[in-house]
Amino acid sequence: MINALIINYPWFMYLVVGLFSLAVGSLLNVIIYRLPIILQEEWKEQCCELFHFEQRKEKIKLNLFLPRSFCPHCKAMVKAWQNIPLLAILVLRGRCYQCDSPFSIRYPFVETLTTVLSLYASWHFGFTIQLLFALLAIWILISLVFIDLDHQLLPDSLTLGLLWIGLIANTQNVFVSLDVAVLSCAGAYLALWLFINLFYLMTCKVCMGHGDFKLFAAFGAWLGWMYLPIILLISSITGAIIGLIYLKINGKSRDTAIPFGPFLCISGLIAMFWGDSIINWYIGYWM
């Protein structure tokens, strides 16, 4: 029945993906905002226990689902209908109903980006098992991009989750065979680990965090070793160019830390969608 629906009414399937991804985009906004706060609270608790500090009296009681979404300015609870993606932004003209403070433009941007990438993935992969896993990867990568931009943090719950989902997908050879996925995952982590440690020995500077290792390893688990050079090359070039422009415009020193995770995420998506075309172009151009 589902196959008949896909064949006879593809527009309906795109509509389902579009509406569902809008809702997912709204959830991603919650994850992007709350997950770093939750992690920071956990780390503070662990520090208090480890060093026998007095327990903190004021604790932020927050998880990914409770309390309900609220205005970051006046803390007014968002009404149920105001959680409908994009609709509330349009009806309320992008402002809180209680204090009239403007919402961040990021909220509709994340929802729109999630929808556009999900629809493109549907067109690119078709309505197959590849699409199901690709959508999971896209949603996790969007979360990682904005969390890293805000906090220079790539949470293990997301990077390692992405890694394991990739390995699970490839137990069925969705993108590559399982043996290639496992070896590529281990090789990707080891390669970056060796490079960063050699760089530190020569310069006494840390140029990349361990979260980047895990994210790069996750791409190995998903796509195999063949795409890793593409991901590393594109992310390094774009990161260097955009980083230099950012430092120049803002008058920052060269020692200013710039998150590398967003460039890895974007490069990973490029490899997922157009990796074969890039490899074929390279072979045709040089061979």
Swiss-Prot record:
Query: Which Pfam families does this UniProt record tie to the protein?
Result: A24_N_bact, Peptidase_A24
Quote the cofactor binding remark: Zinc is required for the N-terminal methylation of the mature pilin, but not for signal peptide cleavage.
Enzyme Commission number, as recorded: 3.4.23.43, 2.1.1.-
Where primarily located? membrane
Membrane-spanning ranges:
12-32, 127-147, 158-178, 182-202, 215-235, 259-279
Alphabetically list the UniProt keywords. Answer: Cell inner membrane, Cell membrane, Hydrolase, Membrane, Metal-binding, Methyltransferase, Multifunctional enzyme, Protease, S-adenosyl-L-methionine, Transferase, Transmembrane, Transmembrane helix, Zinc
GO terms, biological process: methylation; signal peptide processing
List the record's Gene Ontology CC terms alphabetically: plasma membrane
Q: Does the keyword Transcription regulation apply?
A: no
Record GO terms (molecular function): aspartic-type endopeptidase activity; metal ion binding; methyltransferase activity
Q: Which InterPro entries match?
A: Peptidase_A24A_bac (IPR014032), Prepilin_IV_endopep_pep (IPR000045), Prepilin_pept_A24_N (IPR010627), Prepilin_peptidase/N-MTase (IPR050882)
Catalytic activity, as annotated: Typically cleaves a -Gly-|-Phe- bond to release an N-terminal, basic peptide of 5-8 residues from type IV prepilin, and then N-methylates the new N-terminal amino group, the methyl donor being S-adenosyl-L-methionine
The cofactors it requires, by name, are: Zn(2+)
What cystine pairs are annotated? none
Annotated residues that bind Zn(2+) are located at C71, C74, C96, C99
Q: Looking at the record's lineage, which domain of life comes first?
A: Bacteria
Topology with regard to the membrane? Multi-pass membrane protein
Please state where this protein is localized.
Cell inner membrane
Q: Does the keyword Metal-binding apply?
A: yes
PANTHER family listed in its UniProt record: PREPILIN LEADER PEPTIDASE_N-METHYLTRANSFERASE-RELATED, TYPE 4 PREPILIN-LIKE PROTEINS LEADER PEPTIDE-PROCESSING ENZYME
Q: What is the protein's known function?
A: Plays an essential role in type IV pili and type II pseudopili formation by proteolytically removing the leader sequence from substrate proteins and subsequently monomethylating the alpha-amino group of the newly exposed N-terminal phenylalanine.
As for family, the record states:
Belongs to the peptidase A24 family.
What name is this protein filed under? Prepilin leader peptidase/N-methyltransferase
Recorded source organism is: Legionella pneumophila
Instruction: Specify the taxonomic lineage.
Output: Bacteria, Pseudomonadati, Pseudomonadota, Gammaproteobacteria, Legionellales
